[in-house]
Regions:
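Core catalytic lobe of class I
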Residues: 2-3, 7-261
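Cysteine-dependent PTP/DSP-like catalytic domain, specifically the C-terminal lobe
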Residues: 258-272
């Protein structure tokens, strides 16, 4: 029903399945249209361009970038349900004469309406080796909520079943949660690798691909079955794959036609 409404206002998608619609368009236009039609999103998961001049992005002036990103985040706020979450994967920016690794969080702090509920550290393990710095091995996932006192969070869905730490009850007895350990706010999940003889099985031609294990945890932990999930920079389509695998609906915006083709090929191989 929700996807039918989306198609009514946005038109024919670039690609669709029973539970996913992908639009080849600027996400700002898409978010504005969703707001105008009164549709609400249960959870948004995304990783916008970091503005560090990578091959797939145009570098902006810092203030311009902050305004651009804040306008998108506030647009997402306007279309989020009262119990909804926004999971934002961010990296670091270099500010000339001030800092080499400044968290994007600091730039957004006073300019967005969401409540920052928690910062998740994604420790991806392998990466670039540095000689004059500590080698970077993590990125952040900022967990924003609309209502600080009431939000969707399914801890039991994302517990680590292989680790069961005992805890003490009021009567002094020790017991373990049979579903496993709380995964904590540090997630050890390997990144998608590339290169001859070392490329991940899920690797596509997208240069900044989310690993399925990462987004799978986000989808299960911060949304409910049949919820509507948005990824405004859907890139390689990992969010859509995880929505299909976990019984969620997904809207994805991607401005690159080449990446939309990657998504089409990938979703054609994914069971719906």
């Amino acid at each position: 029903m929700k996807l039918t409404k989306i198609k009514t206002v946005l038109g024919t998608p670039y690609f669709e399945t029973e539970s996913v619609v992908i639009y080849n368009m600027d996400c700002k236009e898409g978010i504005r249209t969703i707001k105008d039609c009164g549709l609400k999103i249960d959870c948004t998961i995304t990783s916008p361009p970091y503005n560090i001049g990578k091959e797939y992005e145009d570098k902006m002036h810092l203030v311009e970038y902050r305004k651009w990103l804040a306008s998108i985040v506030n647009g997402i706020y306007d279309i989020t349900t009262d119990y909804g979450s926004f999971l934002l994967n961010v990296g670091y920016l270099e500010i000339p004469h001030r800092g080499k690794a400044v968290p994007i969080t600091y730039l957004l702090w006073e300019h967005i309406n969401f409540y920052l509920n928690q910062e998740i550290v994604w420790n991806y393990g392998a990466g670039v080796a540095c000689k004059k710095l500590l080698s970077p091995r993590n990125e952040k996932i900022l967990w924003y909520v609309k209502n600080a006192n009431a939000y969707t969070f399914n801890l039991d869905e994302i517990r680590d079943p292989d680790v069961k730490y005992p805890f003490q009850k009021k009567n002094g007895k020790l017991r373990c949660n049979t579903l496993g350990k709380n995964p904590s706010d540090v997630w050890q999940i390997a990144k998608v690798t590339s290169g001859e003889n070392r490329a991940s099985a899920e690797r596509t031609d997208h240069p900044a691909q989310f690993p399925i294990d990462l987004i799978d945890r986000v989808v299960k932990g911060f949304s409910n079955p049949d919820d509507l999930i948005l990824d405004p920079f859907i890139g390689s389509g990992t969010t859509a794959v995880c929505c299909i695998n976990n019984g969620r609906k997904c809207i994805g915006f991607e401005i690159s036609t080449d990446y939309c083709e990657i998504i089409r090929e990938r979703l054609n191989q994914t069971k719906n």
